[in-house]
Amino acid sequence: MNLVRTAMLLAFMTALFMFVGFLIGGRAGMMIAFLIAAGMNFFSYWNSDRMVLSAYRAQQVDERNAPEFFAIVRDLARNAGLPMPKVYLYDSPQPNAFATGRNPENAAVAASTGLLQALSPEEVAGVMAHELAHIQNRDTLTMTITATLAGAISMLGNFAFFFGGNRDNNNNPLGFVGVLVAMIVAPLAAMLVQMAISRTREYSADRRGAEICGNPLWLASALGKIARGAAHVPNEDAERNPATAHMFIINPLSGERMDNLFSTHPDTENRIAALQEMAQSGMNVSTGPVRAVNPTRKSRSVPNTGRGGSQPPRGPWS
């Protein structure tokens, strides 16, 4: 089903790209936009995950420089019956996390240094289980491609003014009004697609994540802490790349941005309530042979991500 959704997404984004191209340059602009969109679709399938990780300057870690964090992800992946994903950390004081990759065999999970500092090991396990659920549900391909194409469409809408703003442009059938429409409609349409994709999948990932880690309350507690942190601690890389907001477990954009006029995520309180109800009903075990992860409590130092000094890397809580 997700393959069908991904194909529909690519078709919609391509059509939107062509529409903006038509508004800017008529039929010639539409054909150029089609060729660009086709190339971007191909490129996004193979490289969008690396682009997102690069945008946040995420550093890959392993059992040597992040032993406890890596072990949590490894145990959760085993519980879920998934191949071990690549594990990344990115340097940000805001607690948050995301997953990416075109399939479970080529997937990655990334957490911020702020997440490891602010959350307990159990809460980190809940968050990583949620991200692994996205991988298992094959949400990551659609979410990552959406981030790449939405960013490109928003940028195209901004460029429309400069390349199509000439009132005397004979190639532009709708003139200056058409350019204004492109500037407004393109980013808005991309935002609406992000909303539709993210909101319908977060509840499913919450539920499956609770099953993977074995305790819905771990994730519920983590969501509350992350939401409070995201509301007060900015993520500068996310502010520069708002098209990736729907990939995170909690919207990383500050409340002052107009991007939050249409939220990319369900209400956090509703998500927490659903997890608490799941715990109260005893529905914390999946149909498969899942055992609860039991993270070892240690101090919360985090590995060096290569951006803040030359101290030797250490594992979280080590």
Curated annotation (Swiss-Prot):
Indicate the family of this protein. Belongs to the peptidase M48B family.
Its Gene Ontology cellular component terms are:
plasma membrane
Q: Which cofactor does it need?
A: Zn(2+)
**What InterPro entries does UniProt report for this protein, alphabetically?**
HtpX_protease, Pept_M48_protease_HtpX, Peptidase_M48
Q: Subcellular localization, per the record?
A: Cell inner membrane
Query: Which topology term describes how it sits in the membrane?
Result: Multi-pass membrane protein
What gene does the UniProt entry assign to this protein? Answer: htpX
**Active site (UniProt):** 131
Location of the region described as Disordered in the Swiss-Prot/TrEMBL record: 284-318
What is the species listed in this Swiss-Prot or TrEMBL entry?
Rhizobium etli (strain CIAT 652)
UniProt keyword list: Cell inner membrane, Cell membrane, Hydrolase, Membrane, Metal-binding, Metalloprotease, Protease, Transmembrane, Transmembrane helix, Zinc
Q: Which GO terms describe its biological process?
A: proteolysis
Per UniProt, the cofactor note for this protein states: Binds 1 zinc ion per subunit.
Q: Which domain of life is it from?
A: Bacteria
In alphabetical order, the GO MF annotations are:
metalloendopeptidase activity; zinc ion binding
Q: Which NCBIfam families match?
A: PRK01345.1, PRK03001.1
Might you give the EC number(s) for this enzyme? 3.4.24.-
**TM region(s), chain numbering:** 6-26, 28-48, 145-165, 173-193
Per UniProt, what is one Pfam family of this protein? Answer: Peptidase_M48
Give the binding site residues for Zn(2+).
130, 134, 202
Any idea what this protein is called? Answer: Protease HtpX homolog
